[in-house]
A protein has these predicted regions:
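A residue-level signal for conserved active-site and pocket-lining positions in enzyme catalytic cores
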Residues: 14, 38, 42, 124, ...
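Nuclease catalytic cores
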Residues: 6-51, 84, 106
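Hydrophobic (often cysteine-bearing) scaffold residues that line and stabilize catalytic clefts
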Residues: 34, 38, 80, 84, ...
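A non-catalytic, helix-rich entry segment at domain boundaries
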Residues: 40-107
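Mg2+/Mn2+-dependent nuclease catalytic core
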Residues: 103-201
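Short, intrinsically disordered, charge-biased short linear motifs at domain edges
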Residues: 1-4, 204-220
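Short helix-capping/linker segments at secondary-structure and domain boundaries
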Residues: 26-27, 46-54, 96-98, 165-171, ...
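Cysteine-cluster motifs in flexible loop/terminal segments that predominantly coordinate metals
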Residues: 12-19, 211-235
Length: 235
C-alpha cells in the first residue's frame, strides 16, 4: 500500500473524512489562514539561504508576502495583513539573531514500513550553531502557550525523524519548536519508543483502510470540519 503523510494524518483526524477525500473524491478546500502565507515566506527564506548562501532582506520577504496576500486578498480582512507582517518581522529578527543556518526546507522522503510506503515532506532542518548538529525546526504562529505534552507525542515529529534517520550518515532526534508570535521556544526529542509508536500507528491505519473502516470521529473538531454536511454522523 502507498500512502502520503497527508492521507495518514487525515485518517487519524477522522476516517470518514479520509473516505470522502480519497475514495469518494469529495475534495473541499481547507480555509486558508494568514499563517499559511507567512509559513510559505519562511520556507522561501530557508531556500534562499541554501541556494544563494546569503540572507535575504526583510524587504524581499515583505514583497513575497504581499504578493501572496494580494492573490488571496478576498479571503482576509486588512487586519490580517498587518498581523502577518508582524509575524514575518518577528521571524526575521529571530532568525538573524540566531544566525539560523538551514540545511533543507521541506525535504521529500519515502519511508517503508513492512509493505507500506509513506511519502511526504519533512519540516525544515537547521544546523545548531553550538553543537553543529542537525535538528528539525517547527514554527508555530498562534498565540496559545506551547502544549509540551502534545509536542512530546506529536506523530509528525516522530515520522520526520524516522524518515530522515534512514540515512546512515546523519541522525536527527531533536526538534526545536518556535512560536513566532509570542517568542516561546521548546525542545523535544524522539527515541526508539516513539519510533515503535509511529510504526504501529502506520500499520493500524493501513489495516483500517484495507478493511474499509471509515467511521466518523465525532468530537469537538466536527463543528469546524468542512465535511460535516456530508458526514452521516450529522444526518
Amino acid at each position: 500500500m502507498e500512502l502520503t503523510e497527508q492521507q495518514m494524518f487525515d485518517y487519524i483526524y477522522c476516517p470518514a473524512l479520509y473516505d470522502f477525500k480519497y475514495n469518494k473524491n469529495v475534495v473541499l478546500e481547507k480555509p486558508k489562514k494568514i499563517s499559511d502565507l507567512v509559513n510559505q515566506v519562511c520556507n522561501y527564506f530557508f531556500m534562499y539561504i541554501i541556494e544563494f548562501k546569503k540572507i535575504p532582506s526583510l524587504a524581499m520577504l515583505s514583497n513575497k508576502y504581499e504578493k501572496l496576500y494580494l492573490k488571496d486578498k478576498e479571503l482576509f480582512d486588512d487586519s490580517k495583513y498587518t498581523s502577518g507582517l508582524f509575524l514575518l518581522r518577528n521571524f526575521y529578527n529571530w532568525a538573524c539573531q540566531e544566525k539560523l543556518t538551514p540545511f533543507s526546507s521541506n525535504m521529500p522522503f519515502a519511508l517503508t514500513i513492512d509493505d507500506i510506503e509513506i511519502y511526504g515532506y519533512t519540516n525544515p532542518i537547521v544546523i545548531n550553531k553550538n553543537s553543529k548538529t542537525f535538528e528539525f525546526l517547527f514554527l508555530k504562529y498562534n498565540n496559545r502557550l506551547l502544549d509540551t505534552n502534545d509536542l512530546d507525542k506529536k506523530l509528525k515529529f516522530s515520522l520526520d525523524c524516522l524518515a530522515f534517520n534512514q540515512n546512515p550518515n546523519y541522525k536527527i532526534n531533536v526538534i526545536k519548536v518556535k512560536n513566532i508570535r509570542n517568542n516561546k521556544e521548546y525542545i523535544t526529542s524522539r527515541n526508539n519508543n516513539d519510533y515503535k509508536r509511529i510504526k504501529s500507528t502506520i500499520k493500524n491505519i493501513s489495516n483500517g483502510i484495507k478493511n474499509k473502516v471509515f467511521y466518523p470521529s465525532e468530537g469537538i473538531k466536527c463543528k469546524d470540519c468542512p465535511y460535516k454536511y456530508y458526514c452521516k454522523a450529522w444526518n
